[in-house]
Regions:
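RNase H-like DDE/DDD metal-dependent nuclease/strand-transfer catalytic core used by mobile genetic elements
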Residues: 1-158, 216-217, 224-257
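Mixed-charge, low-complexity intrinsically disordered regions
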Residues: 153, 165-257
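Short clusters of hydrophobic/aromatic residues that line enzyme substrate/ligand-binding pockets
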Residues: 161
Length: 257
């Protein structure tokens, strides 16, 4: 989805197959990856160890893991994602079950000259309309995935496996169990801006593919009017292409004023 300025960040538990977070972002900054990770640990606590891709966009996540769990204990394993079968399977499923629909819609819009990816107004409008729709689809699919029976685990769901595994191990003096059951939740109720400022974390300058950020070509008042006028989640008879057209038209009218 990079072509249209979108990227999905996500995490999956290797034992239970529970997806703790899938988040659609309009950039691939390290701060965006960190935001997704913080959202995950607020709900499921800080894991003992995680696997991360070699990409620089995950540097802030590695830093936070070392802050929360301590340095030099192997809290983060870095390497190519192809060595992580769980996450590779997850990305295949996410594309086939959720993203492929929008991939085809966007390609169709380009072929019909409805969408010009070199036009900032078109790109902002595309993201305005489709980011919340895709995020909602990801949320629904995540809930379905976490509630589906796993054939090789006696028909238990990822939710059940995660809960049962946590209860079975709750008495262990391990980092994961201490984080889950005995750590003050306020320690993980952290804000991304505070972390970036406290540890002086800056965006890496060696991210291989940098997604451009499309700012609203509107005044604050016009943008607020857009939010009040056009709901990106409203019903559509054309897979939201009609809503996209209305947003483009609205911006065009505003810019002529």
């Amino acid at each position: 989805m990079n072509r249209w300025g979108m990227v999905v960040f996500g995490q999956i538990d290797g034992f239970s197959r529970l997806i703790s977070q899938l988040h659609l972002s309009t950039d691939n900054k390290a701060s965006s990856a960190l935001f997704t990770f913080i959202t995950s640990i607020r709900e499921y606590s800080v894991p003992s160890r995680i696997r991360l891709d070699n990409g620089s966009e995950f540097n802030h996540v590695e830093h936070l893991m070392n802050v929360l769990n301590g340095e030099n204990r192997g809290s983060v394993i870095r390497g190519p994602s192809v060595h992580n079968q769980r996450i590779e399977r997850l990305w295949r499923d996410v594309f086939s079950k959720v993203l492929s629909k929008y991939y085809n819609i966007f390609n169709h819009m380009e072929k019909c000259n409805v969408l010009d990816i070199l036009n900032p107004i078109h790109m902002f409008s595309l993201q305005y309309v489709f980011v919340p729709r895709i995020q909602n689809a990801l949320k629904q699919w995540t809930q379905a995935h976490n509630s589906h029976p796993v054939r090789t685990e006696k028909k238990q769901t990822p939710n059940q496996l995660w809960f049962a595994g946590s209860m079975e191990s709750r008495g262990e003096n391990s980092t994961a169990m201490n984080n889950l059951f005995r750590r003050n939740i306020s320690e993980t109720n952290i804000e991304i801006d505070e972390i970036l400022a406290e540890y002086q974390l800056e965006e890496p300058n060696n991210i291989k593919v940098v997604l451009p950020r499309y700012e609203a070509p509107l005044t604050p008042q016009q943008l607020n009017e857009l939010y009040l006028t056009i709901n990106p989640m409203e019903n559509s008879v054309s897979e939201a292409i009609d809503i996209f057209g209305r947003v483009v038209q609205y911006i065009g009218v505003c810019r002529r004023l």
